[in-house]
Amino acid sequence: MYAVLTAIIAYLIGCINNAYILTKYTRKIDIRNYGSGNAGATNVLRVLGYKAAAPVFALDVLKGVIAVLIGKYLMGNTGAMIAGIAVVCGHNWPVFLKFRGGKGIATSVGVVMTVSPLLGLIALAIGVTVIVLTKYVSLGSITGSVTFVLLNAIFWNSTQIFIFSLILASLAIFQHRSNIKRLLAGTESKLGQKTEIK
């Protein structure tokens, strides 16, 4: 019963799409109609720039943190992991936006930094390094997600947290499947390439 309640609460928190809300009420646009069509911080960055993207990223991280803390309060570490997966699913497929959301990376950052701070920080650092070196946000996001899985395999804690990391990485890779195709084709947009709003 608590597992279901935890998942529902976390999913609904994830459904609060900050990219959509902030751009809708500050710029009067639906961010999903611009750039990549993704309702997330990276697309806000691409379309509107750093000043618009920063609060979106921060709030997306925050909702991951809040969901995990609620899950931990209700069910301990198991609840934290259930909530972590559910909040990312809510961000990716929000019921209030006809299941058209973001890719879950900023929210995943909040999740892993709360569930496993040390390994999460290492994975984040590696992901950010890849972004800085290549200018590909998608590549850095995927690398960071996979790194978190590898770190959990190397510094084994429990089967539960390894499966948790595997599910999060699978969600990230699935949401970036079109980016992966563009990376392989050499047509992926780099950080700094901006789509102007008319």
UniProtKB/Swiss-Prot annotation:
Q: Which GO terms describe its biological process?
A: phospholipid biosynthetic process
Return the Pfam families for the record: G3P_acyltransf
User: Where is it predominantly found?
Assistant: membrane
Membrane topology term: Multi-pass membrane protein
Q: Reply yes or no: does the keyword Hydrolase apply.
A: no
Q: Which GO terms describe its molecular function?
A: acyl-phosphate glycerol-3-phosphate acyltransferase activity
Which protein family is it in? Belongs to the PlsY family.
What protein am I looking at? Glycerol-3-phosphate acyltransferase
